[in-house]
Amino acid sequence: MKVIYKITYPNGKIYVGKDLTDSINYFGSADSGLIERDFSREQRRDFSVRKEILWESETASDSEVSAKEVEFIRALRSNDPKIGYNQWPRRNGEIYA
């Protein structure tokens, strides 16, 4: 099963990604440095994230899954640094600092 998922962090920010294997243990490849800046050492001692499956398919090609991932990133605005941790696709030429 191929899936598009959303990870929600304790601060409410999100990360949208794809998993072509539907691994229960896969939580994406968001930039750890971006996430670490948003949490103190104390907050990191007790840290929970939520993973939601937004879309799934047994028949979609890998390129269809990639297109669906971009669709969800744009719809949920997870590439807006105020909302999420996706760094791609870029929003209006913005670069994460």
Predicted features and spans:
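Structure-specific nucleic-acid interaction/processing domains
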Residues: 1-97
